[in-house]
């Protein structure tokens, strides 16, 4: 290693100019085959899979701010598949499998760390519900099991098993639970897409949707008009507003979702620990910081500002689980905007507008679905609207057909 450093130090060409991973923006073309609205994880993943596996490269990603700067940058990077319904378990399990291979596929380290997730049960009713979830997960290949207090103590020795009002009775242990660097995921997909000819246009806001009859023909942006054959909507918390511009309604309500992080400390917590009764989850990052999150704010609001009220609530509940955390200092707090459905499942697939495809309703669980969402949306677009089997249960029509996919019981702390 020292000889390699010496060689570079004596080289006249070092440091050398290197090509940027993501090319600088260019002028908008007048026409694209596909326009993807939203430059977050889902948007760039869809573009990546369109280009790599379907040969569709005349694609423009339009992002009103910057790459991965919305909910992709604001989530707490939890990856899991221990959901309640067969539809949900199959979908998120497929996403976990893709996450496991992303670093190799990108040749780019997304810092994927599979450390397991532990969800605490504080009542007999929750224990029964967890037993059902464990069996559903096992049936579809997930590594999930119900464990007792002794096993919990061995997994997380620092956890307080006897909070004053809510003693821990059991836990749902999900071995596939993991984390990854959310910005690395977005950049990996964007790099792979742009290297194959996809254009990423940041600071480009879509202000209107162009239609002829019931068919989308293009979009209007702050940089001009673009004609296109298809549009993919992937704008997270602003999904209902954009759909309204296209001429239809989505059954979504936007809520702020807050999280916070402490000063870094020595490693003491390997698994991700959550409690739906306490409305709180805690994890330790690779840098030693403690990330604390919980449920969405109780009021609908398009705001990404944090609040003292939720800060006090989350900190109190985190200290119930780990009392020694009262000695730590809080570094920062932030919020994102979630687009919640009534059944806590996404809306994916066709819309009432021809060639206008929906990727919405991700609430607090969008990051963990990024790879499989991009894969299935790319297949949907490339096939001209043939909905993949995996996302058929998440169609918009399920609300009018009373075929909801109820995952509310599996989103511990609304996550």
Predicted segment positions?
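Dinucleotide-binding Rossmann-like beta1-alpha1 core, especially the glycine-rich loop
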Residues: 76-158, 279, 309, 317-322
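Extreme N-terminal leader/targeting segments of oxidoreductases
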Residues: 1-34, 52-57
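Active-site lid/adjacent beta-loop-alpha segment flanking the redox-cofactor pocket in flavoenzymes
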Residues: 264-357
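Flavin (FAD/FMN) cofactor-binding and adjacent substrate-gating region
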Residues: 2-10, 101, 113, 122-196, ...
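Central helical "cap/lid" subdomain
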Residues: 221, 225-270
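Glycine-rich Rossmann-fold phosphate-binding loop(s) that bind the pyrophosphate
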Residues: 39-42, 64
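Glycine-rich FAD pyrophosphate-binding loop
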Residues: 51-72
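C-terminal catalytic lobe of FAD-dependent flavoproteins
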Residues: 319-415
């Amino acid at each position: 290693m020292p000889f390699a450093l010496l060689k570079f130090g004596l080289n006249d060409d070092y440091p050398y100019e290197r090509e940027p991973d993501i090319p600088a923006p260019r002028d908008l073309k007048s026409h694209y085959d596909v326009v993807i609205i939203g430059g977050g994880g889902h948007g760039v993943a869809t573009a990546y899979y369109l280009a790599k596996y379907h040969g569709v490269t005349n694609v423009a990603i339009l992002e009103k701010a910057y790459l991965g700067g919305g909910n992709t940058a604001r989530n707490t990077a939890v990856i899991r598949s221990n959901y309640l319904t067969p539809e949900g378990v199959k979908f998120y399990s497929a996403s976990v499998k893709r996450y496991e291979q992303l670093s190799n596929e990108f040749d780019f380290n997304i810092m994927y760390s599979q450390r397991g997730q532990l969800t605490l049960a504080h009542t007999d009713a929750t224990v029964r519900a967890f037993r059902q979830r464990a069996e559903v997960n096992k049936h579809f290949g997930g590594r999930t099991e119900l464990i007792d207090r002794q096993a919990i103590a061995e997994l997380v020795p620092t956890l307080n098993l006897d909070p004053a009002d809510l003693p821990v009775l059991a836990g749902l242990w999900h071995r596939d639970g993991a984390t990854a660097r959310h910005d690395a995921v977005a950049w990996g997909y964007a790099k792979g897409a742009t290297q194959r000819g996809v254009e990423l246009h940041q600071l480009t806001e879509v202000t209107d949707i162009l239609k002829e009859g019931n068919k989308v023909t293009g979009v209007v942006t702050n940089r001009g008009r673009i004609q296109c054959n298809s549009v993919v909507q992937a704008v997270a918390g602003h999904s209902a507003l954009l759909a309204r511009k296209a001429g239809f309604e989505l059954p979504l309500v936007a809520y702020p979702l807050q999280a916070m992080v402490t000063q870094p400390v020595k490693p003491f917590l390997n698994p991700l620990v959550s409690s739906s009764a306490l409305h709180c989850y805690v994890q330790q990052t690779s840098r030693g910081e403690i990330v604390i999150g919980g449920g969405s704010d109780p009021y609908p609001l398009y705001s990404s500002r944090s609040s003292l009220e939720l800060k006090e609530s989350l900190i109190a509940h985190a200290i119930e689980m780990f009392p020694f955390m009262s000695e730590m200092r809080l570094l920062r707090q932030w919020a994102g905007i979630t687009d919640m459905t009534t059944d806590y499942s996404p809306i994916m697939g066709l819309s009432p507008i021809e060639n206008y495809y929906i990727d919405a309703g991700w609430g607090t669980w969008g990051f963990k679905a990024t790879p499989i969402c991009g894969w299935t949306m790319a297949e949907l677009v490339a096939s001209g609207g043939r909905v993949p089997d995996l996302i058929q249960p998440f169609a918009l029509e399920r609300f009018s057909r009373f075929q909801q996919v109820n995952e509310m019981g599996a989103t511990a702390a609304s996550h």
